[in-house]
Amino acid sequence: VDGNHENFDLLNSYPVTAWKGGKVHEVRPGILHLMRGQVFQIEGMKFFTFGGADSIDKHYRKEGVSWWPQERPTEEEFAEGMKNLEKHSYSVDYVISHTAPLNVVEKLTVCSTLLDPATIMLSVFQEKISFKHWYFGHFHQDTTLDNYTALYQEVVPAAGTIA
């Protein structure tokens, strides 16, 4: 999934194709960008994906060079996510996002600038769906809080957590 420091002009120039039930950008053969608001069925498991987040340092960056406004998820992407989740009865095995829902963000940081629209959208998804585990990045730490795992340097298999 995308984060908040991607070159979205480049990322969005790749062809959109269908893969495992959802939409992806094919960056190279075998290298896929799992697009926002998609449900993928992989090896008998369902994954919901929703990338993006606001950059807290964007005032130091230059638009189109080191910062892109497309880092912030749109209402259309949110609506597509809801539509796709409804098709799966709001039930998935795993969620993969860049940032996290508000209640998780509050446990990880006291920085209110991290409470961006993506966080709010994820909180709405969180209220509607059932899932086994939620994986996210953005906070540059490896930690598990209940069934939410922040990943930075660790790599874990689905259903894995940080000890």
Where are these regions (language model features)?
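Long, contiguous hydrophobic alpha-helical segments, chiefly transmembrane helices and signal peptides
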Residues: 1-2, 33-34, 47-54, 95-100, ...
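Core catalytic region of metal-dependent phosphoesterases/phosphodiesterases
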Residues: 1-41, 110-111, 115-122, 127-128, ...
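Active-site environment of divalent metal-dependent phosphoester hydrolases
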Residues: 4-10, 40, 55-58, 101-105, ...
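Amphipathic, positively biased hydrophobic alpha-helical segments used for protein targeting
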Residues: 14-18, 55, 62-63, 148
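Short glycine/proline-enriched coil/turn segments at helix->beta-strand junctions
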Residues: 16, 43-45, 90-91, 130, ...
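Active-site-proximal loop/helix segment associated with metal-binding centers of metalloenzymes
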Residues: 22-29, 38, 42-112
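C-terminal capping/extension of enzyme domains
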Residues: 47, 135-163
